[in-house]
Amino acid sequence: TGSFQSQDKFKCFVSIAGISDFTKLLRSETFFRGSAKMNKIMHGDAFEDKEYLDSVSAINYTDKIKKPILLIHGTYDTQVPHNQSSMFYNKIKNSNDSVEYFEIPKATHYFDEQGNRFVMFREIERFLAENLN
């Protein structure tokens, strides 16, 4: 949310396995696999709370986000599907040419394997070096 609510405070943004569309995520099968009641308590209801969820979903503000963004997501993420990052990238790339999407094959939500963490941190380091000069 900082990318669209507090842009002036940052030079760039890094999103690691981030949620870009809360409503879509809560309506997906990923969140119906677990306890529906627990998901509603923790995250809200995708139908009853749609207005609020849309207001905190970055995908609805892509035209306002002008700072560089690095999106990193693992393809084996079972907590937040990697399409949350890819659909955000596909929408924002037309209005922000400083956005990068880096997908890490077989990486989980927590980047459990050391090799995946190394790749992730290497990309973050490169991106920050380029954008924080």
Kindly give the residue locations of the regions a language model identified.
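Active-site-proximal cap/loop segments of hydrolase catalytic domains
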Residues: T1-N133
